[in-house]
């Protein structure tokens, strides 16, 4: 059983570096049996590598504007990503990436961390660093949604 953690984001853009920071923490001191991939700002480039691992579970972590307080963490239903037109800094919408992978992977979990400041050369804010630490600590023994709440998408 292979679990893959895909960390997404740009460490040069303030809070968008949440994913890469998580990848760094895992590289320094692994938690659980996750195969960690730092997808950076072009995670679509890792589709083939992820498929070759044939994971049972894929956890994608990214800073995502969900309209919450900075540092809040939510599980986002992959089907909601396109509808919400989530603001990400990546070349390709993450729902495309998920659609490419979910045929081959049993479980795809998308975990969003609400950023505060996303801009070139801004430092990462403390609430985001704290959120990354929370996610990192929960990786070992991760079950289901890792104890994180599901994002409630408001009906228009």
Swiss-Prot record:
EC number(s) per entry: 3.4.23.51
UniProt-annotated binding residues for Ni(2+): 16, 62, 90
Domain of life of the organism encoding this protein: Bacteria
InterPro entries documented for this protein: Pept_A31_hyd_mat_HycI, Pept_HybD-like_dom_sf, Peptidase_A31
Matching Gene3D superfamilies: HybD-like
First-level EC class: hydrolase
Keywords: Aspartyl protease, Hydrolase, Metal-binding, Nickel, Protease
Function: Protease involved in the C-terminal processing of HycE, the large subunit of hydrogenase 3.
Quaternary structure, from the entry: Monomer.
Family the UniProt entry places it in: Belongs to the peptidase A31 family.
Protein name: Hydrogenase 3 maturation protease
């Amino acid at each position: 059983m292979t679990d893959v953690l895909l960390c997404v984001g740009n460490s040069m853009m303030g809070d968008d570096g949440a994913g890469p920071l998580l990848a760094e923490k895992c590289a320094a001191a692994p938690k659980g049996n996750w195969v960690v991939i730092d997808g950076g700002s072009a995670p679509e480039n890792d589709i083939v590598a992820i498929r070759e691992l044939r994971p049972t579970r894929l956890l994608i972590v990214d800073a995502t504007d969900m309209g919450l307080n900075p540092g809040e963490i939510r599980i986002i239903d992959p089907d909601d990503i396109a509808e919400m037109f989530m603001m990400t800094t990546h070349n390709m919408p993450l729902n495309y990436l998920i659609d490419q992978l979910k045929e081959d992977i049993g479980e795809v979990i998308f975990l969003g961390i609400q950023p505060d400041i996303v801009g070139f050369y801004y430092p990462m804010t403390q609430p985001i660093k704290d959120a990354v630490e929370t996610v990192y600590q929960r990786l070992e023994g991760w079950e289901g949604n890792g104890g994180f709440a599901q994002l409630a998408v408001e009906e228009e």
